[in-house]
Amino acid sequence: TFASQRHLWLTVNAEPRFSERWGTRAELILRRAEEGRTWQQVQFRVAPVWNPRRDLQVSVGYLFSRTFPYGRFPVRRVFNEHRLYQQLVLRSALGRFAVAHRYRVEQRWSRPASATEPGRYTSVFTNRARYQARAMLPLAGQVAATPGPYTAVSTEVFVSFGAQVGRNVFDQFRAYGGCGWQLTKAAGIELGYLQQINQQSNGTNFERNHTAQLTFNINPN
């Protein structure tokens, strides 16, 4: 069963650097469902960041997530998730395109409402692997990450694994396209459209989420 839904996501990314190789990353994500009328999710991510080379970034971080009932296949109650993750980003140039490959492994602890005991929560631990490919093209002839307009596309695949994974091993697929403006070397804004295919834990219900996404990037050095 497929449910088609419309969402609004707002993301604020900050990645200040303390030195040529070391920095930190903080990310706040506010997700609204049903064309913005109800809450879907709130997430906060923080991680130290190591840049051993210009084309390589390594980070190990923590994410807190709060999920609300929404849409055709709502969760039973609001619940929280705590997540650790390890991430590797490889960057390269393909002509005028700036290309990034992001590999992420997550360990997820959540407490959704019990399916068999009303009023009780169950503890669930799962692992998830994610791969994202993103390409960015400057539109005014500028070098990537310097002021000016640009366009970007990306795809991302999510695969769950572990003893407590339900029937949604596939988990998610995302495809994104958008345009942005690098305001300064340290700040930019991006607006785009994201289509998300999200498989539910029963393995038979799928969300097809059409999402307008607004992102603010802040990268002070």
Tell where the protein language model's regions lie, with residue ranges:
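Residues on the lipid-exposed face of transmembrane beta-strands in outer-membrane beta-barrel proteins
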Residues: 12-16, 46-50, 86-90, 131-141, ...
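Residues that define the transmembrane beta-barrel architecture of outer-membrane proteins
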Residues: 6-8, 40-42, 80-84, 123-131, ...
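Transmembrane beta-strands of outer-membrane beta-barrel pores
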Residues: 28-34, 62-68, 92-94, 105-109, ...
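Extracellular loop and loop/strand-boundary signature of outer-membrane beta-barrel proteins
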Residues: 30-34, 71-75, 116-123, 162-165, ...
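Transmembrane beta-strands of outer-membrane beta-barrel proteins
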Residues: 9-13, 23-29, 57-63, 100-108, ...
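Short loop/turn motifs that connect adjacent beta-strands in outer-membrane beta-barrel proteins
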Residues: 20-21, 55, 93-100, 139-149, ...
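Gram-negative (and chloroplast) outer-membrane scaffold detector with strong preference
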Residues: 47-70, 74-111, 126-137
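Outer-membrane beta-barrel transmembrane domain signature
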Residues: 103-190, 194-197
